[in-house]
């Protein structure tokens, strides 16, 4: 077991920072004694800090934990704590922590952790040191000590301020026990499993929904694929037919084109001849007209001479035209100059009008300015300006503006200063008010404190009266107690003579020596085994499980104590006596009892068949019925009824949507309803089947319309070609019959009428297709609603109503059965108490046996696993065999030690119990004898408290007067503050209004002054404009004369040009006549050449039937158009299907479906496994917690009953209760039990009972949780305890030491100021020395070891 040996302290709290203090810890008891404030608790704080890293409470983040720099007179104080201890295997370890406290310049102190290290020794004896971060060392030391950190914090090294934590608030108590049981990490594990299960459940639902969607998509995808394959096959055949037709048409068109080219050339020549003849006639007519129109015929001149004459006349005319152009340009320049001058005159006239307007406005502006200035002079009594006559001169105005501006600035600054002064006054009054309120609060607080002191003193007086009464009543019991002392002493001497403690101790020493030798041999074998075996951790687990089996067997033996045996004798006298008569050996005796209990259990169960079994069965039935009833209630209220309501609301919403759609599309719904006249059960008269049929009909109708649209488009193109061909060839393109004029006109008119009607038909078809698509889309959207509505009406709602009806019937039956079972349980519960104790023992033994069997099966599994993975089986088997032999020997010795220990323990307990009773009686006698002195002391204390109360009452009255005075002064100051504030606000408002008026007037005067101009300057500008106008009018007159002269020259030139033009025209007409004559002769020659070519082509043209060829081509084209239309529809369908298949929804849809299916199945498997894990872990935790709490409460009961001397509490227990929440949290509370009555101890016990209960609980926790660490430190355990309980507590500690002293490493550390308590503890002779803590001359804590005999 772990044990601590030495502690070095330097610079902690009041310990000297320059010199280290060392304390040795003894086994099994270490006593530390000192006055209050000497530094005793610092030792516990250092132990706790070294082992856990936890600072003491209220130490300012470590600054108060180190010796203060101001007291030491240094800027830095360094501190160190060293602890030497041995781990559970006896290996020495030294833990060291170094700290410092630095004084900063800003009067603040800085705390630092300098170093944290561990020192240990190797097998060769060499020292090994390792440094850690503080957080790592906080985890390392508890592991080395073999105990959890919460046990070190709250149990072993519990601080004095936290020692009463078992009776703290429920939340704090739960936090402590959760840390001790390590509940947080297991709770987190459970919560993590639960959260993960919820996530998986949600994921499974999502995966199922996705699978349903994907399955529907797969069906749709397969259907589209089939349609696509079929359409592609038809489309491929159609394309092949089109290629063949196209090749045939091209060949026939080549032949026809050759013929057409020849015909067209012949026709072109004929046309050209016709045109030339027409041109010839026209030119002859023009030639004759020209000849008739000639005024003069030039017959003697040649053509060249006529052209020369024409050119000369042209040159003269051009010269005259140039002169005319120049004159016209000069005229335009003169006109533009006149326009410019007119614009300048207009502009000067407008500027002249503006100046005249300004001159007329100056008087009104001056008058307005002077009026406003006069008002300001009168308002503010400006003496310098009162006597000045109007209008004001410019210098007067400037001076006035300057002065009035200065007055405005003075007014603004005055307002600001006034506001600042008044705010200072208000702030001063507010500060006085605040001070009065602070004084009143201080007086009130002081009065409340004194009142609480009076109340506390009154309670103390009542307590003193009770103690005086108790001591007065106990004086008459002296003779009775003396007789009891004599009788107890005689019984004690008899018990000591009967017990052979020395012989038993000698046997135990010999067996312990032998056990140690065997343990060393086992350790040697185990070390050899570890070298050979790679599964060290598995071997360790095997050893732990074997120890668990031994511990469980010991627990079974401890359960079969004398009390249980007596109980079995009472229940089964014959069976038990037959087994017990001839057995001397204790182990064999208990083994026989255990063997006999197994066949006895059915016998007991038969006897309890009427009581316990029937009661348990009834309780189970009752619980099942109650759970069923609760489930039915919950299912009705939380599941069925909300679902039914939800479904009905959903149905109403669907009905509303359908009704709205019926109103909007009444004609369509009438068609649907007409097909459903015989169906009266379905609401709205619409079924899913009829609705789907209607949608299919609409799809067929839409397909027919689209086909009609494509056919009409083809007809439009084809008929236009027929019209064109008919006009060209005068025959029908289909039948190739020639048509005369009327037939052709009628034929073309019929085709054109049909073609003209096609756009209207196409437009009408587009509208019908669009309407059909819209209606189809609306019906498709409405189809899911119809489906859901029908499912609700026919399935969901009837099923829910049927479930509701069945649940209501079950609820009625369950209520009747629950009442019946409850009455039966109440009648049988009182009859099962007699068998409860023995049954609980049997249950415990049965559970322990099951646990042993479970552990043995786990051991077998571990051994099989190790043997499978082992590489050297033979060597391991040999070592295992030797190890088993040694372990068997060790078990035999341990059984013998256990037998001797139990016998020694029973004898010691009997002797100790008699000694305790004797000491208790002596203490009562001493207490009663000293009662008279105590009564006088209590009465003096009572008088002193009464006088203190009177004094405090007078002080409270004086404080109340001060409070009233402060409140009155505060009210007066508040009234003054409000009056000043109102007056200030009124004056500020008046000043602000005056300032605004002043600012508006000043701005107005400045604006008017800026508009005033010099009149002389305006008149000067007006004269200049008038002079400019006169000059411009003179220039305008000159330009007008020049313009008239130019116009006269232009008229003369134009007359000359007109006379020359007559001669020129005669020459031109003669030239034109001669040209036309030559052209007519040239055309006659062309006509003769063309006629010769026509004769040649008509002779060489082959006679080929072109009409039949055209009919064949038209037939092929018609077939080609028909197939083209079909392929276009197929191509559209193929593209649509391919687009549909290329959507992300259908891409890799088979793989997605497969992956989703696998994921769903694996997720469901994982969810089931998580449920199993959660239930197994939860069950294991609750079972462990229940067993551990039973062990703790048994230990508490044993210690309490041997310690507490009062008769008001039989025992105390820790109750652990599961909360009703879903998280299954466990709440704890400490209860005190008297008879069958159980009360919460918190708030109902005295201070002494509180301290004793907390100590007992800590002792019990240490006993049950510290299997590898036998250390326990108690700091001032006797505070608030009376003398009788102090002595009894000391005896209990001695009993614990006595029972544990054989355990290697058990240490009890007690810190106290009560030397009498130390004397009680010294009676056990478990320590020769004690440590005394004192303060030296420098007020540093000093440790000194002294002999216990000196006390």
UniProtKB/Swiss-Prot annotation:
PROSITE patterns named among the record's database cross-references: ZN_HOOK
Taxonomic lineage: Eukaryota, Amoebozoa, Evosea, Eumycetozoa, Dictyostelia
GO biological process, alphabetically ordered: chromosome organization involved in meiotic cell cycle; DNA recombination; DNA repair; double-strand break repair; regulation of mitotic recombination; telomere maintenance via recombination; telomere maintenance via telomerase
Coiled coil: 182-224, 250-290, 338-358, 458-562, 606-715, 760-1045, 1074-1128
Pfam family, one: AAA_23
Cofactor note: Binds 1 zinc ion per homodimer.
Reaction catalyzed: ATP + H2O = ADP + phosphate + H(+)
Protein name: DNA repair protein RAD50
Subunit: Component of the MRN complex composed of two heterodimers RAD50 and MRE11 associated with a single NBS1.
Chief site of localization: nucleus
Enzyme class: hydrolase
Binding residues for Zn(2+): 732, 735
Family statement drawn from the similarity comment of this UniProt entry: Belongs to the SMC family. RAD50 subfamily.
EC number: 3.6.-.-
UniProt key word Cell cycle: yes
Annotated keywords: ATP-binding, Cell cycle, Chromosome, Coiled coil, DNA damage, DNA repair, Hydrolase, Magnesium, Meiosis, Metal-binding, Nucleotide-binding, Nucleus, Zinc
All residue ranges annotated as the Zinc-hook domain in the record: 688-784
One GO location term (cellular component): condensed nuclear chromosome
GO molecular function terms attached to this record: ATP binding; ATP hydrolysis activity; double-stranded DNA binding; double-stranded telomeric DNA binding; G-quadruplex DNA binding; metal ion binding; protein-macromolecule adaptor activity; single-stranded telomeric DNA binding
Record-listed ATP binding positions: 13, 36-37, 39-42, 66, 68, 160
Gene3D superfamilies for the chain: P-loop containing nucleotide triphosphate hydrolases (3.40.50.300)
Highest taxon of the lineage: Eukaryota
Annotated domain remarks: The zinc-hook, which separates the large intramolecular coiled coil regions, contains 2 Cys residues that coordinate one molecule of zinc with the help of the 2 Cys residues of the zinc-hook of another RAD50 molecule, thereby forming a V-shaped homodimer. The two heads of the homodimer, which constitute the ATP-binding domain, interact with the MRE11 homodimer.
Compartments in which it is found: Nucleus; Chromosome
Function: Component of the MRN complex, which plays a central role in double-strand break (DSB) repair, DNA recombination, maintenance of telomere integrity and meiosis. The MRN complex is involved in the repair of DNA double-strand breaks (DSBs) via homologous recombination (HR), an error-free mechanism which primarily occurs during S and G2 phases. The complex (1) mediates the end resection of damaged DNA, which generates proper single-stranded DNA, a key initial steps in HR, and is (2) required for the recruitment of other repair factors and efficient activation of ATM and ATR upon DNA damage.
Cofactor(s) the protein needs: Zn(2+)
Residues binding Mg(2+), per UniProt: 41, 160
């Amino acid at each position: 077991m772990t044990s601590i040996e030495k502690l070095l302290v330097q610079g902690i709290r009041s310990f000297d920072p320059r010199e280290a203090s060392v304390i040795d810890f003894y086994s099994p008891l270490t006593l530390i004694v000192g006055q209050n404030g000497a530094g005793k608790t610092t030792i516990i704080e250092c132990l706790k800090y070294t082992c856990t890293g936890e600072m003491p409470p209220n130490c300012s983040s470590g600054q108060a934990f180190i010796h203060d720099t101001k007291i030491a007179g240094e800027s830095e104080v360094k501190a160190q704590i060293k602890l030497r201890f041995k781990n559970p295997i006896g290996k020495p370890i030294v833990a060291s922590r170094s700290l410092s406290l630095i004084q900063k310049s800003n009067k603040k102190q800085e705390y630092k952790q300098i170093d944290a290290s561990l020192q240990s020794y190797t097998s060769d004896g060499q020292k090994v040191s390792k440094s850690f971060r503080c957080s790592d060392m906080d985890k390392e030391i508890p592991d080395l000590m073999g105990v959890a950190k919460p046990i070190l914090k709250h149990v072993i090294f519990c601080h004095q301020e936290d020692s009463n934590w078992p009776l703290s608030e429920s939340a704090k108590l739960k936090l402590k026990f959760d840390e001790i049981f390590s509940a947080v990490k297991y709770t987190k594990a459970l919560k993590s499993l639960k959260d993960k299960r919820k996530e998986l459940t949600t994921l499974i639902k999502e995966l199922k929904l996705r699978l349903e969607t994907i399955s529907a998509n797969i069906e749709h995808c397969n259907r589209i694929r089939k349609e696509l394959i079929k359409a592609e096959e038809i489309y491929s055949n159609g394309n092949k037919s089109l290629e063949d037709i196209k090749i045939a048409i091209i060949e026939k068109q080549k032949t026809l084109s050759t013929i057409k080219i020849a015909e067209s050339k012949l026709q072109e020549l004929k046309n050209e001849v016709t045109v030339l003849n027409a041109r010839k006639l026209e030119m002859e007519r023009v030639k004759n007209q020209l000849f008739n129109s000639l005024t003069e015929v030039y017959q003697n001149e040649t053509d060249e001479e006529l052209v020369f004459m024409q050119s000369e006349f042209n040159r003269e005319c051009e010269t005259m035209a140039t002169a005319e152009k120049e004159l016209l340009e000069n005229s335009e320049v003169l006109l533009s100059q006149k326009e410019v001058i007119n614009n300048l005159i207009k502009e000067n006239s407008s500027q002249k009008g503006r100046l005249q307007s300004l001159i007329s406005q100056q008087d009104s502006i001056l008058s307005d300015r002077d009026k406003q200035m006069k008002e300001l002079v009168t308002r503010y009594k400006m003496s310098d300006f009162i006597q000045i006559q109007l209008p004001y001169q410019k210098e007067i105005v400037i001076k006035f503006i300057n002065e009035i501006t200065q007055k405005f600035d003075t007014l603004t600054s005055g307002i600001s200063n006034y506001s600042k002064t008044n705010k200072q006054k208000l702030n001063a009054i507010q500060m006085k008010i605040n001070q009065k309120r602070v004084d009143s609060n201080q007086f009130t607080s002081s009065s409340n404190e004194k009142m609480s002191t009076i109340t506390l003193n009154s309670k103390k007086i009542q307590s003193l009266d009770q103690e005086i009464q108790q001591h007065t009543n106990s004086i008459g019991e002296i003779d009775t107690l003396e007789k009891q002392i004599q009788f107890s002493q005689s019984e004690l001497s008899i018990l000591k003579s009967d017990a052979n403690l020395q012989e038993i101790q000698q046997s135990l020493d010999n067996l312990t020596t032998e056990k140690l030798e065997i343990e060393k041999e086992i350790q040697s074998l185990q070390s050899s085994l570890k070298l050979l075996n790679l599964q060290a951790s598995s071997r360790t687990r095997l050893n732990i499980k074997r120890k668990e089996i031994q511990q469980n067997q010991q627990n079974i033996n401890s359960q079969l104590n004398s009390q249980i045996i007596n109980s079995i004798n009472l229940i089964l006298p014959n069976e038990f006596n037959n087994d017990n008569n001839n057995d001397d050996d204790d182990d064999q005796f208990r083994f026989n009892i255990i063997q006999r209990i197994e066949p006895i259990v059915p016998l007991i169960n038969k006897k309890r068949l009427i009581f316990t079994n029937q009661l348990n069965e009834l309780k189970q039935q009752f619980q099942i019925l109650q759970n069923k009833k609760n489930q039915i209630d919950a299912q009705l209220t939380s599941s069925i009824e909300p679902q039914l309501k939800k479904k009905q609301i959903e149905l109403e919403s669907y009905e509303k949507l359908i009704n709205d759609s019926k109103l909007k599309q009444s004609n369509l719904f009438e068609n649907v309803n007409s097909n459903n006249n015989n169906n009266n059960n379905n609401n709205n008269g619409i079924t899913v089947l009829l609705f789907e049929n209607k949608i299919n009909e609409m799809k067929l109708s839409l397909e027919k319309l689209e086909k009609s649209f494509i056919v009409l488009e083809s007809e439009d193109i084809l008929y236009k070609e027929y019209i064109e061909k008919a006009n060209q060839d005068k025959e029908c393109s289909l039948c190739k019959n020639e048509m005369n004029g009327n037939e052709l006109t009628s034929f073309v008119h019929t085709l054109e009428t049909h073609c003209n009607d096609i756009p209207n038909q196409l437009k009408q078809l587009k509208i019908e297709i669009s309407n059909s698509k819209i209606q189809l889309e609306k019906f498709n959207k409405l189809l899911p609603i119809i489906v859901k509505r029908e499912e609700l009406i026919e399935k969901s709602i009837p099923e829910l109503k049927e479930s509701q009806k069945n649940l209501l019937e079950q609820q009625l039956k369950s209520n009747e059965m629950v009442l019946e079972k409850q009455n039966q349980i109440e009648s049988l519960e009182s009859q099962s108490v007699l068998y409860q104790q023995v049954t609980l023992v049997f249950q415990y033994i049965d559970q322990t046996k099951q646990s042993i069997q479970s552990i043995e099966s786990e051991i077998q599994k571990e051994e099989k696993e190790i043997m499978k993975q082992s590489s050297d089986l033979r060597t391991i088997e040999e070592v295992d065999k030797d190890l088993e032999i040694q372990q068997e020997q060790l078990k035999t010795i341990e059984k013998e030690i256990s037998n001797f220990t139990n016998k020694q323990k029973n004898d010691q307990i009997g002797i100790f119990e008699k000694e305790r009773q004797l000491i208790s009686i002596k203490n009562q006698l001493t207490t009663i004898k000293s009662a008279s002195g105590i009564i006088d002391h209590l009465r003096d204390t009572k008088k002193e408290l009464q006088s203190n109360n009177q004094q405090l009452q007078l002080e409270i009255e004086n404080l109340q007067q001060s409070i009233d005075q402060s409140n009155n002064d505060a009210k007066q100051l508040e009234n003054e503050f409000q009056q000043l504030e109102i007056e200030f606000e009124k004056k500020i408002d008046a000043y602000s209004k005056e300032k605004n008026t002043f600012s508006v007037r000043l701005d107005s005067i400045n604006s008017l002054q800026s508009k005033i101009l010099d009149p002389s300057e305006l008149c000067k500008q007006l004269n200049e404009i008038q002079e400019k106008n006169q000059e411009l009018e003179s220039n305008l007159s000159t330009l007008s004369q020049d313009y008239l002269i130019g116009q006269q020259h232009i008229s003369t030139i134009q007359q000359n040009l007109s006379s020359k033009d007559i001669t020129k025209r005669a020459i031109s007409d003669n030239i034109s006549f001669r040209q036309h004559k030559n052209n007519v002769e040239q055309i006659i020659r062309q006509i003769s050449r063309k006629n010769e070519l026509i004769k040649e082509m008509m002779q060489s043209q082959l006679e080929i039937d072109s009409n039949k060829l055209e009919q064949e081509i038209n037939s092929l084209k018609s077939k080609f158009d028909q197939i083209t239309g079909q392929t276009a529809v197929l191509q559209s369908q193929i593209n649509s299907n391919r687009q549909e298949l290329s959507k992300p929804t259908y891409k890799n849809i088979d793989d997605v479906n497969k992956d989703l299916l696998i994921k769903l199945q694996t997720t469901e498997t994982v969810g089931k496994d998580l449920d199993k894990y959660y239930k197994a872990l939860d069950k294991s935790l609750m079972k462990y917690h229940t067993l551990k709490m039973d062990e703790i409460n048994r230990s508490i009961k044993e210690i309490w009953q041997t310690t507490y001397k009062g008769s008001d509490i039989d025992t105390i227990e820790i109750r652990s209760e599961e909360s009703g929440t879903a998280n299954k949290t466990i709440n704890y509370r400490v209860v005190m039990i008297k008879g069958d009555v159980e009360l919460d101890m918190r708030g109902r016990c005295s201070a002494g009972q509180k301290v004793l209960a907390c100590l007992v609980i800590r002792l019990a926790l240490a006993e049950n949780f510290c299997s590898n660490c036998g250390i326990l430190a108690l700091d001032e355990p006797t505070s608030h305890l009376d003398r009788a309980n102090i002595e009894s507590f000391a005896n209990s500690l001695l009993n614990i030491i006595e029972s544990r002293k054989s355990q290697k490493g058990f240490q009890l550390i007690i810190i106290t100021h009560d030397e009498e308590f130390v004397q009680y503890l010294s009676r056990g002779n478990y320590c020769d020395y004690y440590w005394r803590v004192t303060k030296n001359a420098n007020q540093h804590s000093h440790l000194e070891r002294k002999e216990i005999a000196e006390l």
